[in-house]
């Protein structure tokens, strides 16, 4: 009996395959106590798959992309998928080189880049930040650049560049630092002068005059850039080289009125002796400043934009590796007057002013931002996620809930600066302020009534009898769009206004207000004849007829006498 059970178990194990056998091998010791023989799994049974990667390991970013983008359909089975994921993760995080803190920093950095808005993600990823601090610096610089477009009328690429000190440059992989230098030399068709290259490698500060002499013996370079271009700058990533190839436009470097601009000097700050003005002990302060110790390694004009031999700069410029920044300012001009030095930023600005790429599939209305489209779609779906805790009323937008809550709190945050009257909503304040601006009032030619320009066309409909808003259900017409919306609730049966006391619901807010007076006992309408008060205006009108009838009766009796 036992032998037959053992044979059956062995047969089922053979059907399950070596994967299950390997998992059971972990429990080999308990199995021996139970009298079961351990089964050794041959390595060949796991398959002969090996990672199909080249001998030279790819860079961590490539491995990360392969790790995130791997699909189960691309591999032969679960074993291969798991093995490949482990290998890609190891090549990405490099546990044999990085500490636990560094690995955690990489994971946090990846998640930080993931949650960034799409328009920022591309910029930050192009700079390949090595830490979260570098990524934050890029985001802040880009935000400052975008915020400053209206005041400065110019966006410069340095606002979006990652600052690399000599220490950070040394921490870069040799392949990456060499690639940055080789890319710069390849794009410019030039090489570093030997005298300067050795001193740059040794982190020595080169006198300004020597830089100018090495780069331009005739001294025309200083004349061409007097007061216009920076001499010391940040070492930017190779993103600029790629952008120049794509757009053909140089990216000007200019960083002003920002923390990164400390120690950022231009040729206009260079005196005749070739030193920086404001430095007490020649270059001692520069040596102590990590920000100022970064000489520009690569900033070049695209080949199409370089001056010819006959131009002022001369042919020597093409063969020299400049330690100064040279850029031709060719801003993109927008209709609003803002200038942009990069086509991507110009495209973003153009979308904000013109394009509405997000379109509603129900009504065809377009929006500039995706969030506005989501907010609009709640009109069609009827979703009202924001509810008032006082009365239970729900709203589709948080701003509408905020306005509604002021009816409970009595808050009136909007104040008229001329008369001091306060209002709950900004629209009410704007309507009130029109009473102070008499110049915007117009007189109706039909009846002589004076009204604001915003209400003039609405008032003229009273005389013309125009009713442009028509109900498709019953073909009833209305003068105002709001009246049509209120009327629609009769057909849909919608009653959005509910009483917080008794739960009764109404299709109009005015009806709810009248109903609530039953619970509060409020009687706002007062008869001027006898002082009696009423909850509704219709009740007051009915009551006033009593006094009118008494007057008429008294008049008839006097005439008879």
From Swiss-Prot:
Segments of skewed composition (Polar residues): 265-274
Keyword Cell membrane listed: no
One Gene Ontology term of the molecular function aspect: DNA-binding transcription factor activity, RNA polymerase II-specific
Function: May be involved in transcriptional regulation.
Intracellular or extracellular location(s): Nucleus
Record location of the Glycyl lysine isopeptide (Lys-Gly) (interchain with G-Cter in SUMO2) cross-link: 40, 203, 228, 254, 282, 443
Source organism: Pan paniscus (Pygmy chimpanzee)
Pfam families referenced in this protein's UniProt entry, alphabetically: KRAB, SCAN, zf-C2H2
Stored CDD domains: KRAB_A-box (cd07765), SCAN (cd07936)
Start-end of Basic and acidic residues biased regions: 238-247
Name of the protein described by the UniProt record: Zinc finger protein 394
UniProtKB keywords: DNA-binding, Isopeptide bond, Metal-binding, Nucleus, Phosphoprotein, Repeat, Transcription, Transcription regulation, Ubl conjugation, Zinc, Zinc-finger
């Amino acid at each position: 009996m036992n032998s037959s059970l053992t044979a059956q178990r062995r047969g089922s194990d053979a059907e399950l395959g070596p994967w299950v056998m390997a998992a059971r091998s972990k429990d080999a010791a308990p199995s021996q106590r139970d009298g079961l023989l351990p089964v050794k799994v041959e390595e060949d049974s796991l398959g002969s798959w090996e990672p199909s990667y080249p001998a030279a390991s790819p860079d961590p970013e490539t491995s990360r992309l392969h790790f995130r983008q791997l699909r189960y359909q691309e591999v032969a089975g679960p074993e291969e998928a798991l093995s490949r994921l482990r290998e890609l993760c190891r090549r990405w995080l490099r546990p044999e080189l990085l500490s636990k803190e560094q690995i955690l920093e990489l994971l946090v950095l990846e998640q930080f880049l993931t949650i960034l808005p799409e328009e920022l993600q591309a910029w930050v990823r192009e700079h390949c930040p090595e830490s979260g601090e570098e990524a934050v610096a890029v985001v802040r610089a880009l935000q400052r650049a975008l915020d400053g477009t209206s005041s400065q009328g110019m966006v410069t690429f340095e606002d979006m560049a990652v600052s690399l000190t000599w220490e950070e440059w040394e921490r870069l992989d040799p392949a990456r630092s060499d690639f940055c230098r080789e890319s710069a030399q390849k794009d410019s068709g030039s090489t570093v002068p030997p005298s300067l290259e050795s001193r740059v490698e040794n982190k020595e500060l080169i006198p300004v005059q020597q830089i100018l002499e090495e780069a331009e013996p005739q001294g025309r370079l200083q004349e061409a850039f007097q007061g216009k271009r920076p001499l010391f700058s940040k070492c930017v990533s190779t993103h600029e080289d790629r952008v120049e190839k794509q757009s053909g436009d140089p990216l000007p470097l200019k960083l002003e009125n920002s923390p990164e601009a400390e120690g950022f000097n231009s040729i206009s700050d260079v005196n005749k002796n070739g030193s920086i003005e404001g430095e007490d002990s020649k270059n001692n302060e520069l040596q102590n400043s990590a920000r100022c110790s970064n000489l520009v390694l690569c900033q070049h004009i695209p080949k199409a934009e370089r001056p010819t031999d006959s131009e002022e700069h001369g042919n020597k410029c093409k063969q020299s590796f400049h330690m100064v920044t040279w850029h031709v300012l060719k801003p993109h001009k927008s209709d609003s007057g803002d200038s942009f030095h990069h086509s991507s930023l110009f495209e973003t600005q153009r979308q904000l002013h013109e394009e509405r790429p997000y379109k509603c599939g129900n009504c065809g209305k377009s929006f500039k931002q995706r969030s506005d489209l989501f907010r609009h779609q709640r009109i069609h779906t009827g979703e009202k996620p924001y509810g008032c805790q006082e009365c239970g009323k729900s709203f589709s937008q948080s701003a509408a809930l905020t306005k509604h809550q002021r009816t409970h709190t009595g808050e009136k945050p909007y104040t008229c600066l001329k008369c001091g009257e306060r209002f709950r909503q900004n629209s009410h304040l704007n309507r009130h302020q029109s009473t102070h601006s008499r110049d915007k009032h117009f007189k109706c030619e039909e009846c002589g009534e004076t009204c604001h320009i915003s209400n003039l066309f609405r008032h003229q409909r009273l005389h013309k009898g125009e009713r442009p808003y028509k109900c498709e259900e019953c073909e009833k017409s209305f003068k105002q769009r709001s009246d049509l919306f209120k009327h629609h609730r009769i057909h849909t049966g919608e009653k959005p206004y509910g009483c917080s006391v008794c739960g009764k619901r109404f299709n109009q807010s005015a009806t709810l207000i009248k109903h609530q007076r039953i619970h509060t006992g409020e009687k706002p309408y007062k008869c001027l004849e006898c002082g009696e008060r009423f909850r509704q205006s219709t009740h007051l009108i009915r009551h006033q007829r009593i006094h009118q009838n008494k007057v008429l009766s008294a008049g008839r009796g006097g005439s008879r006498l």
